[in-house]
Design a protein with these regions (language model features):
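Long, helix-rich, hydrophobic modules that act as membrane-proximal anchors or helical bundle/coiled-coil regulators
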Residues: 45-48, 52, 58-59, 64-215
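Amphipathic, membrane-active segments
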Residues: 6-64
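Membrane-inserting effector segments that mediate pore formation, membrane fusion
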Residues: 1-32, 193-215
Length: 215
């Protein structure tokens, strides 16, 4: 291995190691006991990917170890894509549901938000795996080949973002949500009860829903 290639490889490995440590910390803080098994698989994946960046010198300097690590990364890439697909499918399913009330819509949003955190972390891990793969090949294969899986998933997630945007727009109109003021028009019996108070102030026409519900 050329000295320049080794130095560059070690530099990228250190960067990757730091990124994974930060991501691991964020995922560890997510609390959802119903998703404990899924969370465990995500954390295990991160730990396994992190290993490649921790033993950077040994792996890069030994061709046998390097080839073994490349094979191992292929398996981790498949695992990452499986977990990411699960997150994407769940987000897609949730955003196909209509909230019958604002409370039910708010609950759906909370579920989507949790899955989006996993989605974001796993997308980063997939990118890091591509980075590692490219680094370990020392330029022997093209970037396009190394990042192919990441590119496919990235395109899929962009389509999902568009679906989510339309889903939020639908509910924004349905519940007459004012995003800027973090409020919505009262509906049903709530609107009837507060109707007389609207003569005093227009503010009684609305109910506050909190900034977290519209961000």
């Amino acid at each position: 291995i050329g000295a320049a290639a080794l130095v560059v490889g070690q530099y990228y490995m250190k960067q990757i190691n730091g990124e994974l440590s930060e991501m691991n910390s964020k995922i560890s803080k997510l609390v959802d006991f119903q998703m404990a098994e899924y969370k465990g698989k995500v954390l295990t994946l991160m730990t396994q990917v992190k290993r490649a960046s921790e033993f950077q010198t040994e792996i890069l300097e030994d061709n046998n170890l390097r080839n073994e690590e490349i094979q191992r990364l292929q398996g981790l890439e498949t695992t990452c894509m499986d977990l990411l697909n699960q997150a994407n499918v769940t987000i897609s399913d949730l955003s196909s549901k209509e909230g019958e009330s604002f409370e039910k819509y708010d609950k759906l949003m909370s579920e989507v938000a949790i899955w989006q955190k996993y989605q974001g972390a796993l997308t980063e891990v997939l990118y890091i795996i591509a980075d590692l793969n490219y680094t370990l090949h020392l330029g022997a294969i093209s970037k396009e080949q190394c990042y192919a899986a990441y590119s496919d998933m990235y395109d899929m997630e962009n389509n999902l973002i568009d679906k989510l945007r339309k889903w939020h727009e639908f509910h924004k109109k349905k519940f007459k949500i004012d995003v800027d003021q973090a409020r919505m028009e009262r509906q049903g019996i709530d609107a009837v009860i507060h109707k007389p108070l609207e003569l005093i102030s227009e503010k009684w026409k609305y109910r506050n829903i909190g900034k977290e519900a519209v961000t």
